[in-house]
Amino acid sequence: MADGGSERADGRIVKMEVDYSATVDQRLPECEKLAKEGRLQEVIETLLSLEKQTRTASDMVSTSRILVAVVKMCYEAKEWDLLNENIMLLSKRRSQLKQAVAKMVQQCCTYVEEITDLPVKLRLIDTLRMVTEGKIYVEIERARLTKTLATIKEQNGDVKEAASILQELQVETYGSMEKKERVEFILEQMRLCLAVKDYIRTQIISKKINTKFFQEENTENLKLKYYNLMIQLDQHEGSYLSICKHYRAIYDTPCIQAESDKWQQALKSVVLYVILAPFDNEQSDLVHRISSDKKLEEIPKYKDLLKLFTTMELMRWSTLVEDYGVELRKGSSETPATDVFSSTEEGEKRWKDLKSRVVEHNIRIMAKYYTRITMKRMAQLLDLSVDESEAFLSNLVVNKTIFAKVDRLAGVINFQRPKDPNNLLNDWSQKLNSLMSLVNKTTHLIAKEEMIHNLQ
């Protein structure tokens, strides 16, 4: 490295002018011996003088050894003030070599892990974060120190401060950091943002992770952590279709597929959330794809429930509750229930949403088989009041799921979509052409018959 040149703090690449390796080899053992005798201040002054010579001569290896030796002696003597002071001093020296500072910071990072005294640890972290601020060549060390600081803050109950500290890091721009470690940092940022209920920032941070990364080897734990965090986020947003997709990703993970209990719970959640999602083309497509999964045979109740929503028949809510209520909310000894319809506020809300999906399914079936129906008859089929039925119908019309027009005075709903004038004209023209062709053919046949009879 020394032969190839070293980089100074101002960005200049310099070549080693004098090799101080022999001098440093001789001086360091002497200094270590003196430091153990309690003459630390004297030793540091000697080493600082030697450091100036090695730095001026651009001897990166020797400078690194001296910087590491200084902080090591301060640490072993437990002179914490002196340690922090020398870290600041050595990193700010004129034309300091970047590689030497990096070596010193890396050495100090090991001390952070070893120190048990919290105030001392926090002060050392603050010093190192100050030294590494804005320096690309020690960005990984700064990121790790920041993560350690955030963990300490969280353990002390200051989750908001922990989230704020960790958000400072833009680790997605750290090219020198391994992809796996980058993802770990981003997941930690997401977790802390969720802990302080900062859902918008969590959504922004989540987009920094490319899900293709989870196709690589040894990423299953990170994949599960990511999708569980995304489920928490989308549960707050009430986006059931997204939650269904997240559970499908968990279900498709090899380590989940390997354990029967885990994949069954994941598949149950997939089924329930796809049913809870409002009807649209994407939801309908996903329902049919999930229905084709052969593993549904092993959880028959959930398979039958999903089939109800793909069959073009009306459902009665009371019958559904009677047949599936206990299984969905409490489970059985063979198939434990999921937390989708738990006894919490969120679970009760999802249960109400399930009833809404049943009603919406029934209205779509009516729109398919009826052209006109009275409000009273529709309310009777839905087991709802007229006002409730009208509210559900209006919602589906607004979302363009179905077409309907309500004649309130007559109390009649018309599901027949009015035809476009151009289409009507085209149909009339086509039918007229067909009629004229038929008349022409008939006239021709009559004339033919007359000619045959005249000949006879």
Curated annotation (Swiss-Prot):
Tell me yes or no: is Coiled coil among this UniProt entry's keywords.
no
What PROSITE patterns does this protein map onto?
Answer: PCI (PS50250)
Q: Which residues carry this modification: N-acetylalanine?
A: A2
User: Where in the numbering of this chain does the PCI domain appear?
Assistant: 242-420
Positions of modified residues (N6-acetyllysine): K368
> Which controlled-vocabulary keywords does the entry list?
Acetylation, Isopeptide bond, Proteasome, Ubl conjugation
Pfam families in UniProt = PCI, PSMD12-CSN4_N, RPN5_C
Q: Does the keyword Methyltransferase apply?
A: no
- Per UniProt, location of the Glycyl lysine isopeptide (Lys-Gly) (interchain with G-Cter in SUMO2) cross-link in this chain: K92
**What GO cellular-component annotations does this UniProt entry give?**
proteasome accessory complex; proteasome regulatory particle
Q: Where are the transmembrane segments?
A: none
Position(s), cross-link Glycyl lysine isopeptide (Lys-Gly) (interchain with G-Cter in SUMO1): K92
Q: How does it assemble?
A: Component of the 19S proteasome regulatory particle complex. The 26S proteasome consists of a 20S core particle (CP) and two 19S regulatory subunits (RP). The regulatory particle is made of a lid composed of 9 subunits including PSMD12, a base containing 6 ATPases and few additional components. Interacts with ERCC6.
Described by its record, this protein's role is as follows: Component of the 26S proteasome, a multiprotein complex involved in the ATP-dependent degradation of ubiquitinated proteins. This complex plays a key role in the maintenance of protein homeostasis by removing misfolded or damaged proteins, which could impair cellular functions, and by removing proteins whose functions are no longer required. Therefore, the proteasome participates in numerous cellular processes, including cell cycle progression, apoptosis, or DNA damage repair.
Similarity comment text for this entry: Belongs to the proteasome subunit p55 family.
What PANTHER family does UniProt report for this protein, alphabetically?
Answer: 26S PROTEASOME NON-ATPASE REGULATORY SUBUNIT 12, 26S PROTEASOME NON-ATPASE REGULATORY SUBUNIT 12/COP9 SIGNALOSOME COMPLEX SUBUNIT 4
Protein name, per record: 26S proteasome non-ATPase regulatory subunit 12
- Name the gene that codes for it: Psmd12
